[in-house]
Amino acid sequence: MSTEKKQNLQDTFLNSVRKSKTPLTIFLVNGVKLQGVVSWFDNFCVLLRRDGQSQLVYKHAISTIMPAQPVQLYEPSADQDD
């Protein structure tokens, strides 16, 4: 068994937008639209910051996350054709 820890797509995405402070729009399952920047996250929730205010959003309530700009999650390899 490998000791190397693999990161899932959700954590990779959230960590990338957190580090780059990319503005997001988060849609909840009830239709509410939230906007802000991810300042922290764990397995169960996301801390969203906007205008000096923080909102703790539970992941089970999130439907969709839309970044305001494209997010590059990995370095494209030289052998890929785009």
From Swiss-Prot:
Q: Does the keyword Mitochondrion apply?
A: no
SUPFAM superfamilies xref list: Sm-like ribonucleoproteins
Pfam families per UniProt:
Hfq
Which residues are in the Sm domain?
11-71
A GO CC term assigned to this protein in UniProt: cytosol
Keywords of the record: RNA-binding, Stress response
Output the superkingdom of the source species.
Answer: Bacteria
GO biological process: any one? Answer: regulation of translation, ncRNA-mediated
- InterPro entries xref list: Hfq (IPR005001), LSM_dom_sf (IPR010920), Sm (IPR047575)
Which GO MF terms are attached to this record? RNA binding
- What HAMAP family does this protein map onto? Hfq (MF_00436)
| Stated role | RNA chaperone that binds small regulatory RNA (sRNAs) and mRNAs to facilitate mRNA translational regulation in response to envelope stress, environmental stress and changes in metabolite concentrations. Also binds with high specificity to tRNAs.
Known partners and oligomeric status: Homohexamer.
Family that this chain belongs to: Belongs to the Hfq family.
Q: What is this protein called?
A: RNA-binding protein Hfq
Gene name for this UniProt entry: hfq
